[in-house]
Amino acid sequence: MKFIFMGTPEFSVPILERLNELGDVALVVSQEDKRKGRGKKFTKTPVKVKAEELGLEVFQPGDINSKEAIDKLREVQADIIVVVAYGQILTQEIIDLPEKYIVNVHASLLPYLRGAAPINRAIMEGHDKTGVSLMKVERGLDAGPVSSVREIEIGDMNAGELEDK
């Protein structure tokens, strides 16, 4: 089974590691490196750092929906694309690329807290629990059928502690 993995933050890294153990990760797609700190040095995304450690090819398009990016993804001829906190909305053209489907791992109990920063929003909104949802990607923001959910009690955990769960 040939995979494309799309992710950016630390939350995505354990899933990339596990996917790499299970199959052929042909391409890792992450957001562009950003300037950070006082020196404004370019800092690699956590997913890029891990992908390089694993010897995987990394692709960092500014716009995942550009012709060049879509052509690159098409070249891979992936069976499945796995998306974990990638950070850009995918067009139908990308959704239709893999042989089988695209799955998204989202850090909330969908349909609640769609979109960015769901862990932080769960805490700020005073939710008792949150979780992780596995869903098939369809057109729309975190839309598509949810196939699996894991609930986590928030308690007195902060966002970093919840991400680690």
Q: What kind of feature is each model-predicted range?
A:
Residues 1-38:
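N-terminal Rossmann-like dinucleotide-binding module
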Residues 2-4, 26-29, 57-76, 81, ...:
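Internal alpha/beta domain cores that form substrate/cofactor-binding pockets in large enzymes
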Residues 7, 38-39, 61, 111:
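Residues that cap or flank secondary-structure elements
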Residues 13, 41-44, 66-70, 88, ...:
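Structural motif corresponding to alpha-helix initiation and N-cap regions
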Residues 34-54:
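N-terminal beta-loop-helix "entrance" segment that forms/cooperates
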